[in-house]
Amino acid sequence: MFVAVRAGKSACRRVSGEAVRVAVDGVVGVVGAPLVSGESAAAGAGGSGGGAPAPPRLPRVPGFAARRADGSVKARGKALRERVPRDAHAEFVPDPARPDAVGAVEESGRGRIPALTPLRVGRMAANPFAFLRGSAGLMGYDLARTPMTRITAQLCGDAHAANFGLYGDARGGLVVDLNDFDETVPGPWEWDLKRLAVSLVLAGRVAGAGEDACRAAALDAVGAYRRTMRLLARLPALDAWNAIADEELVSHTDAHDLLGTLERVSAKARANTSGRFAARSTEATADGGRRFVDAPPVLRRIGDAEAGAVAAALEQYLTTVSEDRLPLLARYAVHDVAFRVVGTGSVGTRSYVVLLLDHRSEPLILQVKEARPSALLPHLATAGFDVPPVAHEGRRVVLGQKRMQVVSDILLGWTTVEGRAFQVRQFRNRKGSVDPAALAPDQLDDYGRMTGALLARAHAHSADPRLIAGYCGKNTELDEAVATFAVAYADRTEKDHAELVTAVRAGRIPAEEGV
């Protein structure tokens, strides 16, 4: 199911028949206040005649809403405008104690594999959009000092424009959604939305779009978020929950200029499978199996001890996947493990690929990726949000992903390798993505609307859409404010990127560029 998100368009929707379960403790609202109040409100009949209302037949059940709320949730959201006017979101004044860009990059590299630091720096130095992708923590520092309603949702934590893409569902279809959750954590919904808007401005500038087109993409992304949240607030709870993001989303977001690009990406995604990766990255062994082949610096073989530790950790992984998936995994044998570099912000973390083969020697590739503490955690604390302890970082990533996506990888899980937390997922699951920095201006605007709508749907799984919709309202005041912020923060990011490039050229920080 999805919706039309351009003003004046009639709403369309498509409902999937399957809901995704999430933990009820992931539903959060205004910090320090319940989403639904009024537990003592009378619920039964017989309260007429001026006497005391009859007590409800059943008590309030923990984990469920109260039968009747005092006042409107949407009205409570609207009332927040008095404390945080919507136009206040245009503000961006860099803190005098803000870390310099090079220092922030160096700090974010602590705990990563030192030999891969030059590769990570080189990727971030490629352009300002790439710098933004690798600096979620630095932006978190800045966002912690911006106006906030204090409505919380499960955040992606790194909702830049390149973190949306296509992937396969269990039935062979393609889903369009957020697809990376390394930084996921409950936090203020505005942070994800502002990061998306900034990234669209930077992607447009890298692509050579004019300033008006870049700002329009950010503006329309926020508008799509606002209108989608408003519609979700009006739907029955189950329909809103099951709002699905699939290949038909483009027609519902009026993103027709993006059709050709999405069709090409979809065709590539359908061919992006474990089988194809194994055909290019493995070779036959004497015992009839297969093993990975070296392709440095991205893919490299590892020693027996390291490979054995990763393989042994899969036993713990099996305890974290849904029990109905165990018979499927039991049909595969573990053949090999290799190290594979991924992403921009993730470069330097430990990431492995595991080759599994079934009885026909058909491959399934699992990714075992290190899960580090979210880069947003210290900044949430600075902003005054409660930051509960995390028992396992891999579990945090997996549960955050399931809370935000309508359809998630059926093999998601987590494990521990030599004391480090990891997440486990399918490596090639018909994944595809649009490069926002390669889009024409009219396509970038469409892409902004599509991703804004997707982000609203993802947030509505954990925050009450009525609360956010009440705050956002019907007019474009919030859209204009966040677009103004996005342009200002994009300017700051360009300066940060220039500082990094200068440091690389001066030899202050090593970089391996073009890889």
Residue ranges and their predicted role:
Residues 35, 55-81:
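Intrinsically disordered, low-structural-confidence terminal and linker regions
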Residues 45-50:
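Intrinsically disordered, low-complexity regions enriched in glycine and serine
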